[in-house]
């Protein structure tokens, strides 16, 4: 079980919840969130996120990482009035260690 504040992710059952409420994620969204939750507080580059959630030979030619990070934010942050995933301009993204607050 991975935890960051009120956010919980179980890699074995592929379940995600925040404040006790289950959150449905696609396989790719789950892979992105798992990458963040394995390294809370650490900045992950777009390359690292691509490696975590896309096939090895995938070449980024668009804003696909930005789009999927937005999808994850819309599911784990917005409904709860939280800001767990932060943009670090020019570098990448980071999941706050507190998961965006209690």
Language-model-detected regions and their locations in the chain:
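Basic, amphipathic DNA-recognition helix from helix-turn-helix-like DNA-binding domains
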Residues: 1-3
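Short, surface-exposed charged micro-motifs
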Residues: 6-8, 84
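A short, compositionally biased
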Residues: 9-15
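Positively charged, aromatic-enriched patches within helix-turn-helix-type DNA-binding elements
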Residues: 15, 20-27, 31-84, 89-91
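C-terminal end segment of the histidine kinase catalytic
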Residues: 97-102
